[in-house]
């Protein structure tokens, strides 16, 4: 049976993006899409999706080391600079089942992307399009149709409720948005 890319990625979640090459022996920079280093550091086998060539491959990591805000990674079978260049910009995926179980007040980015956002009065503000990591706290990017985006800091003062079951988030709008 032939499966579509959507079907192949159904139970998988993006975990990192491959950046520029590093050195001459096929190493690449790996930029995590999670703030959980233990998930990245435990990776052994990943699904590599390259948008340019529309290919999904399985990659086995044989070496990884931490650098300045990213990792240097070496895959089996990628041994030259030219080999590595083919994977620049690729996204790494893992099975959702391999992610650590979170407490009820924690979430993975993929769980909140697309959620509906309402203010305290029940007015629909839009959907979560993106989660930005700022270092001090995450920020939800909310879009409704083509109007301006709303940025909400992910702190208790502004994010009042995240209900994964009903796909709904309730926020208090910051004063500067009034």
UniProtKB/Swiss-Prot annotation:
This protein's GO CC annotations: cytoplasm; ribosome
Keyword Iron recorded: no
Signal peptide extent: none
Transmembrane regions: none
Location(s), subcellular: Cytoplasm
A molecular-function term among this protein's GO annotations: ribosome binding
GO terms (BP aspect): ribosomal small subunit biogenesis; rRNA processing
Keywords of this entry: Chaperone, Cytoplasm, Ribosome biogenesis, rRNA processing
Domain PRC barrel: 104-177
Function description: An accessory protein needed during the final step in the assembly of 30S ribosomal subunit, possibly for assembly of the head region. Essential for efficient processing of 16S rRNA. May be needed both before and after RbfA during the maturation of 16S rRNA. It has affinity for free ribosomal 30S subunits but not for 70S ribosomes.
Oligomer and partners: Binds ribosomal protein uS19.
Domain text: The PRC barrel domain binds ribosomal protein uS19.
Family under the similarity heading: Belongs to the RimM family.
Database matches in NCBIfam families: 16S_RimM
Name the record gives this protein: Ribosome maturation factor RimM
Organism listed in the record: Thermosipho melanesiensis (strain DSM 12029 / CIP 104789 / BI429)
């Amino acid at each position: 049976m032939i499966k579509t890319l959507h079907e192949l990625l159904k139970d998988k979640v993006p975990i990192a993006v491959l950046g520029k090459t590093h050195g001459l022996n096929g190493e690449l920079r790996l930029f995590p899409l999670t703030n959980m280093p233990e998930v990245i550091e435990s990776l052994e086998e990943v699904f590599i999706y390259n948008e340019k060539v529309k290919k999904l491959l399985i990659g086995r990591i044989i070496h990884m080391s931490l650098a300045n805000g990213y990792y240097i990674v070496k895959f089996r079978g990628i041994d030259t600079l030219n080999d590595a260049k083919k994977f620049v910009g690729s996204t790494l995926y893992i099975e959702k089942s391999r992610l650590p179980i979170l407490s009820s007040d924690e979430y993975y980015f993929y769980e909140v992307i697309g959620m509906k956002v309402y203010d305290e009065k029940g007015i629909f503000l839009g959907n979560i399009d993106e989660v930005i990591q700022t270092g001090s706290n995450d920020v939800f990017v909310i879009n409704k149709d083509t109007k301006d985006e709303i940025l909400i800091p992910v702190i208790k003062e502004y994010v009042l409720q995240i209900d994964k079951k009903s796909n709904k988030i309730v926020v208090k709008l910051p004063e500067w948005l009034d």
